[in-house]
Design a protein with these regions (language model features):
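Active-site segments that bind and position negatively charged phosphate/pyrophosphate groups
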Residues: 199-307
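Buried hydrophobic packing segments
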Residues: 84, 111-115, 185, 250, ...
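C-terminal charged capping/lid subdomain of soluble metabolic enzymes
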Residues: 183-185, 280-350
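Non-catalytic interfacial helical region
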Residues: 85-99, 111-126
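A glycine/threonine-rich phosphate-anchoring loop and its flanking beta-alpha core
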Residues: 15, 113-203
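Residue-level signal for inorganic ion chemistry
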Residues: 17, 39, 77, 128, ...
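Short glycine/serine/threonine-rich phosphate/pyrophosphate-binding segments
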Residues: 106-113, 134-135, 249
């Protein structure tokens, strides 16, 4: 078992342990010994794990209800959120009760936002079941849904009281979801995580599957270190958005047919190409990045137009009036923050 403590405004632990899902009450009882519980999941994850988690919670004396919505990024919207919160109200949940987000990034984002806003905030636990959620989105307290204007534009910062990651749940993931998570893992490799790039270069995906718990722990520790410095993303936490400025534009323009990790991979390459043009990154580092991404069977190009990507960037959360904060790779394994105008941003895609 690996336990990583995050000293945020609401301190909590990230527990990474094989088989932990079967002992979920052992971790929740000390935090919430007696309450009503709502388990939020989606149509992909629920058939695998919902019944067993619900039975374990009920056996431990909890009153449990559940809410399952259609899987996919297209469900992460205001209408689905309101339906969830209305259901929570219909179940008479109180501020003393608990929400469990059982699923990947979409489940965690939307369920977390419901927990942040229902009755002005109730406790919640993240139980990530996708690689992307395990290494990134379940940690740090960012919650949100998408709007017509862009991705993650309606949300709140709300730290969970626990993140419980059972790597055995990743065994049911299709290959696409493994690759999706690898997009975010490669991102961490460009944020000075020691040895991560070397490991990914040696045996892409195969090594990752064999040592997934250690890789998850590396990424979570890296994110924890950043979140503890800058919980609400006023400074260094923006580094975690490497590949996201262009990546979010690709997701939105594709109507979310391009998955997040895939879009982040393309976004990293596009930003790196721009950095080479601006003299901020050498061409060899760009080629190594592209080779690493391709080795994980992720794309490095897109048919989405420059105009579409930049239109979405105008609604990026890091945009402030005429300027936007971007993350630029400046060497192989290292990236830096930079503030540019939207006109200057466009030159990175020329």
């Amino acid at each position: 078992m690996t336990r990583i403590h995050i000293n945020a405004s609401t301190p909590y632990d990230v527990v990474i342990e094989e088989g932990a899902l079967q002992r979920i009450t052992d971790y929740i009882k000390p935090l919430k010994p007696n309450c009503h519980v709502i388990i939020v999941s989606d149509s992909n994850v629920a058939p695998h794990y919902l019944d067993s988690v619900k039975a374990n919670m009920e056996h431990a004396g909890y009153t449990v209800c559940d809410y399952v919505f259609p899987a996919g990024e297209s469900s992460k919207n205001a209408h689905q959120l309101i339906d969830l919160v209305e259901y929570m109200a219909a179940q008479s949940l109180t501020r003393k009760d608990l929400l469990i987000a059982l699923g990947g990034g979409v489940v965690g984002d939307m369920a977390g936002f419901a927990a942040a806003t229902y009755l002005r905030g109730i406790d919640y636990v993240q139980v990530p079941t996708s690689l992307l959620a395990a290494v990134d989105s379940s940690v740090g307290g960012k919650t949100a849904v998408n709007l017509e204007a862009g991705k993650n534009l309606w949300g709140a910062f709300k730290q969970p009281i626990l993140v419980l990651c059972d790597p055995t749940t990743l065994n049911t993931l299709p290959d696409m979801e493994w690759k999706n998570g690898c997009g975010e893992i490669i991102k961490y490799g460009f944020l000075d995580v020691p040895g991560l790039l070397t490991q990914l270069e040696n045996k892409p995906l195969i090594t990752l599957r064999d040592s997934v718990s250690a890789v998850i722990a590396r990424c979570v520790q890296a994110k924890a270190d950043i979140v503890e410095q800058d919980e609400r993303e006023s400074g260094v936490r923006a580094l975690l958005n490497l590949g996201h400025t262009f990546g979010h534009g690709i997701e939105k323009a594709s109507h979310f047919e391009v998955h997040h990790g895939y879009a982040v991979a393309i976004g990293m390459v596009l930003m790196a190409q721009g950095a080479v043009k601006h003299g901020e990154l050498d061409a060899e580092a760009l080629e190594k990045l592209k080779a690493l991404i391709e080795a994980h069977d992720l794309p490095t190009t897109t048919t989405i137009t420059k105009k579409e990507i930049l239109a979405a960037a105008k609604h990026d959360k890091k945009s402030e009036g005429a300027t936007i904060k971007i993350v630029v790779p400046t060497s192989y394994g290292h990236s830096e923050l930079k503030v540019v105008t939207h006109e200057e941003l466009a030159t990175y895609l020329d």
